[in-house]
Structures are given as C-alpha cells and as structure tokens.
Swiss-Prot record:
Classification lineage: Eukaryota, Fungi, Dikarya, Ascomycota, Saccharomycotina
Keyword line: Golgi apparatus, Hydrolase
Entry binding sites for substrate: T41, S134, Y137
Enzyme's top EC category: hydrolase
InterPro entries found in the cross-reference section: Cyclic-nucl_3Pdiesterase (IPR012386), Cyclic_Pdiesterase (IPR009097)
Tagged with keyword Hydrolase: yes
One annotated Gene Ontology cellular component of this protein: Golgi apparatus
The EC number(s) this enzyme carries: 3.1.4.37
Location within or outside the cell: Golgi apparatus
Source organism of this protein record: Kluyveromyces lactis (strain ATCC 8585 / CBS 2359 / DSM 70799 / NBRC 1267 / NRRL Y-1140 / WM37)
Family the entry assigns: Belongs to the 2H phosphoesterase superfamily. CPD1 family.
Name of the molecule in the record: 2',3'-cyclic-nucleotide 3'-phosphodiesterase
Reactions listed under catalytic activity: a nucleoside 2',3'-cyclic phosphate + H2O = a nucleoside 2'-phosphate + H(+)
Single GO MF descriptor: 2',3'-cyclic-nucleotide 3'-phosphodiesterase activity
Active site per database record: H39 (proton donor/acceptor), H132 (proton donor/acceptor)
Length: 213
C-alpha cells in the first residue's frame, strides 16, 4: 500500500470513540489482530519522497474538502455507511462499506490524479475504489456461523440497526445490508498521510491536518 491518505473522524470526538470501541470489541474475536484507528482510505500508493510532498497532499485535501463544505449538513454527512462485508483476505476481514458519495469520490479522484499519476482514473474510480472503514484485520478463514452471528450482533447492538445478508459481488466476501444508513462523520475531521509498510503495528503517521466546520 505504501503511503496512503486517510480520512479520519476527529480524535476523541463521539464518532471517533464509537468506531474505536467497535474495532477494539471485534479485535477480541480475532487472535493477534492488530489495533488501529478508525479511518477511510482516500487513496494509497501516493508518490511522496519527502515531507514537503506529504504536506502538499494534506494541503490539497484540505482545500478540496473546504470547497464542498457547504454541501455537508446533518442530512448529508461526508462519510456514511450502508453495509458491511466479511471477507477471506487479511485486509478485507471485516469492514463497513461507505455509502456512495460524490464528494468522497471527487476527493479520491483529485488526489489519485495528482499524487499517483493514474492514467485510467475513471476506471480506477468506478472499478477499484471501494471506500470503507476496516473493523478487523485477520488471516482467520473460514469463520464459523457462530462467529459471524456475533460480529453482526455487535454491530447491530452498537448502532441499533438490523442487518440482512445479500448477494455479494465477490466470491471472497459475504455481504450484509444495513437496515438504515449509519452516519459516520463530517466536520471536524482529520486527514492523515500514513506510511503503511510492514506489520500494521509499524505503520507511521507522517503528518496530519484537522479541518473544522
């Protein structure tokens, strides 16, 4: 993954603490699963050779999100979730899926085009970009039905929502729909540029910026 841009709830906000609690709760179900902070990856594989370029990424993200701030309100959050997946792969083990949002897609497209140099940017955006909030990383597979029920129960209890299994678009994942959209977060929010290399415990936040409402 190299260097990535994360979109995070503001530290110690109610939203941050809620998602952090869920991540820590699910971690107890997966032996040796690392703890990490709540985040949605906007773009990975960024070309950042020095701190000046890291700061350029944050500056661009800051300006871009400020430009759409007027479109964000209590009825139109920047980050929302409408489903969750349980997968085979380590980094796809359990995650909340973001509800499609033009503002988030525009941000990802901008950062990808400027700091990755993607030639087929629209193909990447609509075929490979799947914004989500990871809840657990693990090599455990397969998972028995009792464990899956427990994961669903913890999500349902925390957010007071019911879940329904639906047909998945991937053989490697089981997909579930949430009865109603879960509000994630808007402002304040924090962008972080993170070096995602080696074990998760060794990932390093290179720099960050908080954007207030």
């Amino acid at each position: 993954m190299g260097i990535s841009l994360w979109l995070c709830p503001y530290g110690h906000s109610p939203e941050y603490e809620t998602f952090k609690t869920l991540i820590e709760s699910l971690q107890t179900l997966f032996p040796n699963s690392p703890v990490f902070e709540p985040h949605v990856t906007v773009c990975s594989g960024l070309s950042c050779e020095n701190m000046e370029e890291v700061h350029k990424v944050l500056e661009m993200a800051h300006h871009a999100i400020n430009a759409v701030k007027s479109k964000v309100d209590s009825e139109n959050a920047l980050v929302e979730f409408d489903g969750f997946n349980i997968g085979k792969k380590y980094f796809e083990k359990c995650r909340l899926e973001c509800k499609p949002n033009p503002m988030l897609y525009s941000l990802a497209k901008l950062i990808r085009s400027m700091f990755v140099g993607e030639l087929n940017i629209d193909t990447w955006l609509f075929e490979e970009f799947h914004p989500h909030l990871s809840l657990a990383y693990s090599d455990i597979y397969p998972m028995d039905q009792a464990m899956i029920r427990l994961i669903r129960q913890r999500i349902e209890d925390l957010f007071d929502v019911t879940t329904e299994e639906i047909e998945s678009h991937s053989r490697d994942q089981d997909a579930y729909k949430l009865q109603h959209t879960l509000k994630g977060w808007s402002f304040p929010l924090t962008f972080k540029v993170v070096r995602c290399e080696g074990p998760v415990e060794e990932w390093e936040v290179l720099s960050e910026v908080t954007v207030h409402g």
